[in-house]
């Protein structure tokens, strides 16, 4: 049974061994999610960005329930059954970070995020590194003024670019986002490095994509797996994988 569980976790995209070094900065949120009524409260996960968190697949089709914001909600609720959790997307398809920064105070902060995710790099190629940097910094600073924990995401793939090219635009934006996460001490989901490693290992990234620049359900699950590091302790992660294994076996 143990070996079947490990095998199915691997097939589902859940890297069990990768969960040994858990991030510690979001301990307070994990504690909040464990509280029962009447001591609990609503926890808001806010996803700000472009078409990918919005759930766009093969445009104009939108598959909200397959996108990583919903996948994260499902997984978090599986492990924290007493938590009241909202997954809120303030993302807009086709938008870049400058546009997202302009509506940040009016449309994002009023949701009172407990965790804020920012995912804009795919579309920031159109405005360049310097303008993107200013926009990301503006959003980060405004959120940190309100003591909101932030998780920055590097981009998911665009098949029209060579992900193995270290000088590609998306690689440059990824490096900039990593520096921002370091400088502002935010969380980081390095989607780009993860997919790049898959390509280096010989995987065909087409299996993760709905179209050239939008992930499919399997591609979103790669992102979800990375995000869940911030929500699960190792024991909780193992419990979640076991539940997923049992669900598959019953089908």
Protein language model regions, located:
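Sec/Tat signal peptide C-region and signal peptidase I cleavage site
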Residues: 14-18
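Structural recognition of the beta-strand scaffold that forms the well-ordered cores
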Residues: 44-48, 53, 86-91, 115-120, ...
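Cell-envelope and extracellular/periplasmic
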Residues: 60, 89-95, 117-125, 182
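Active-site segments of SGNH/GDSL-like serine hydrolases
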Residues: 119-123, 139-174
């Amino acid at each position: 049974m143990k070996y079947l569980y490990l095998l199915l976790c691997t097939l589902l995209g859940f890297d069990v061994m990768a969960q040994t070094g858990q991030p510690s900065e979001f301990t307070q949120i994990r504690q909040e999610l464990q509280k029962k009524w009447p001591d609990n409260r609503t926890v808001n996960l806010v996803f700000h960005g472009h078409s990918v968190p919005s759930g766009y697949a093969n445009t104009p089709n939108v598959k909200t329930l397959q996108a990583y914001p919903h996948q994260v909600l499902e997984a978090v609720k599986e492990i924290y059954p007493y938590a009241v959790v909202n997954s809120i997307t303030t993302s807009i398809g086709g938008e870049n970070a400058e546009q997202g920064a302009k509506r940040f105070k009016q449309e994002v902060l009023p949701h009172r995020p407990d965790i804020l995710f920012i995912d804009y790099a795919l579309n920031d190629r159109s405005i360049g590194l310097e303008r993107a940097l200013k926009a990301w910094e503006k959003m980060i600073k405004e959120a940190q003024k309100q003591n909101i924990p932030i998780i920055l995401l590097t981009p998911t793939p665009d098949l029209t670019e060579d992900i193995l090219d270290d000088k590609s635009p998306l690689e440059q934006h990824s490096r900039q986002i990593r520096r921002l996460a370091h400088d502002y001490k935010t969380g980081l989901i390095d989607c780009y490095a993860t997919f790049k490693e898959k390509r280096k290992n010989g995987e065909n990234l087409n299996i993760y994509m709905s179209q050239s620049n939008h992930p499919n359900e399997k591609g979103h699950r790669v992102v979800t797996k990375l995000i869940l590091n911030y929500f699960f302790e190792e024991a909780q992660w193992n419990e979640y994988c076991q539940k997923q294994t049992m669900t598959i076996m019953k089908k």
